[in-house]
């Protein structure tokens, strides 16, 4: 047995009709874990409904429908393998909460695959002022997705078909846009593909023999292996807390940074409750330690279920333990807010697993989105497309960290009017020590503070 392949997370972005589902579906279909029987069932249904155009998008539509109905589909369906990596598509867009998911997302994407519709009219719609191509690329960059692959899709439908001139024109325009966002286009492969016909997806296409670069599969293999933050102090935001008969209180969540293991003394922020971890489990198996990316349940001693809540963060009490934030300063980009945002604005922040109202107590500066340079001091308000530094005050105890130290706890979505109106990353946090924090007997025995 060789060394197990490295896991990477991919987010697929682009305008509504760019062919994201078809392209993603095609990869999963050809390289993935979808059972042949399931595919045959989908194909039969598609044929019955005369969806000739089915093929790959249909696969994804079925998966999405099942996912939205709350049927948890076998996550293997969203995975595929390249020569070097196991790839997971972390959120197929088109999903209502795509932006929110991308931010509070179950995981950080290692690479964004931007799908461009190369057809006449299609490309222009995607890149226009209202097109999602721009918004998604900006979002990916702001949230620290540093690597990107760009697919010029629907090359089978350009005029003339498989047109090099059209491809060149698109590259020029998209490069200049991605540069404005902050990416370096020289480092981005632009792969001409047809997600439907399969050109340059997995095998080289003879229709595109003027193109000498990598296929999509080869481009995925060329992604730089990301570093996982296991050497940082522990941060584990709680998703749920269960009471399990005969075992006791079991908080559940995903290790974002660091590691957790039995015998460790953990502190839960913001309350400061400190106790010992008795055991750590993943998929009903005991672990000696859990690392970043692992979704685990862990048993804690002498703690009532009511003392822990979703959004609390577990950390190692002896290694930079987490604390609640009195206030914090963030770099915010306003994305789709119809009016003006001034001091006193109080939306809801979605950050890791917490969902808490915060007040924009002070808009400090307006800045250039790309360079981060200050344009204006203490502006009266921010509006759509603006970026600024804002001091925020949570209305309830909340745990956040700076994006530079603990990325998953330092990026957030601002929600208002049932949509994401802004995104941001946290630059500094003013932390406060908890008062009257409970330390359990088990923790004292272990020599906690």
Swiss-Prot record:
Assembly, per entry: Interacts with ATX1 isoform 3 in the cytoplasm on the nuclear periphery.
Subcellular location: Cytoplasm; Cytoplasm, Perinuclear region
UniProt protein name: Elongation factor 1-alpha 4
Ranges where the record places region G1: 14-21
UniProt keyword Phosphoprotein present: no
Primary site of residence: cytoplasm
Record gene name: A4
UniProt region (G2), positions on chain: 70-74
Gene Ontology cellular component annotations, sorted alphabetically: cytoplasm; mitochondrion; nucleus; perinuclear region of cytoplasm; plant-type vacuole; plasma membrane; plasmodesma
Organism: Arabidopsis thaliana
């Amino acid at each position: 047995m060789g060394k197990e392949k490295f896991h990477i997370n991919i987010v697929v972005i682009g305008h509504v009709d760019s062919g994201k589902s078809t392209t993603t579906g095609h990869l999963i279909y050809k390289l993935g874990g979808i059972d042949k029987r399931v595919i045959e069932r989908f194909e039969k249904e598609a044929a019955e409904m005369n969806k000739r155009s089915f093929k790959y998008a249909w696969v994804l539509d079925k998966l999405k429908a099942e996912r939205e109905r709350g049927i948890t589909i076998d996550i293997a369906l969203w995975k595929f393998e390249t020569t070097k990596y196991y790839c997971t598509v972390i959120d197929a867009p088109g999903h209502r909460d795509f932006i929110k998911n991308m931010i509070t997302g179950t995981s950080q994407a290692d690479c964004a695959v931007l799908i461009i519709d190369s057809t006449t009219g299609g490309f222009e719609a995607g890149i226009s002022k209202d097109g999602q191509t721009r918004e998604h690329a900006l979002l990916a960059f702001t949230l620290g997705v540093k690597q990107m692959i760009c697919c010029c899709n629907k090359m089978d439908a350009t005029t003339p078909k498989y047109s090099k001139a059209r491809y060149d024109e698109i590259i020029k325009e998209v490069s200049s846009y991605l540069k404005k966002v902050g990416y370096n286009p020289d480092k981005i492969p632009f792969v001409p593909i047809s997600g439907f016909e399969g050109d340059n997806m997995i095998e080289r296409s003879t229709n595109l023999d003027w193109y000498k670069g990598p296929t999509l599969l080869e481009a995925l293999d060329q992604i730089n292996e990301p570093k996982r933050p296991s050497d940082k102090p522990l941060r584990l935001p709680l998703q749920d807390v269960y009471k399990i008969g005969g075992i006791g209180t079991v908080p559940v969540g995903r290790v974002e940074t660091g590691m957790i293991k039995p015998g460790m003394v953990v502190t839960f922020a913001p309350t400061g409750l400190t106790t010992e971890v008795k055991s750590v489990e993943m998929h009903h198996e005991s672990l000696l330690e859990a690392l970043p990316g692992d979704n685990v349940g862990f048993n804690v001693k002498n703690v009532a279920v009511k003392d822990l809540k979703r959004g609390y963060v577990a950390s190692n009490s002896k290694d930079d333990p987490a604390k609640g934030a009195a206030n914090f300063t963030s770099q915010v980009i306003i994305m789709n807010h119809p009016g003006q945002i001034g001091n006193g604005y109080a939306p809801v922040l979605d950050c890791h697993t917490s969902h808490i109202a915060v007040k924009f107590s002070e808009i400090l500066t307006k800045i250039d989105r790309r360079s981060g340079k200050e344009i204006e001091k203490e502006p009266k308000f921010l509006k759509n497309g603006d970026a600024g530094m804002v001091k925020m005050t949570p209305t309830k105890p909340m745990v956040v960290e700076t994006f530079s130290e603990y990325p998953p706890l330092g990026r957030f979505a601002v929600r208002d009017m049932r949509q994401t109106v802004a995104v941001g990353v946290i630059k500094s946090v003013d932390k406060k020590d908890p008062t009257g924090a409970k330390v359990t007997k088990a923790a004292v025995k272990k020599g906690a503070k």
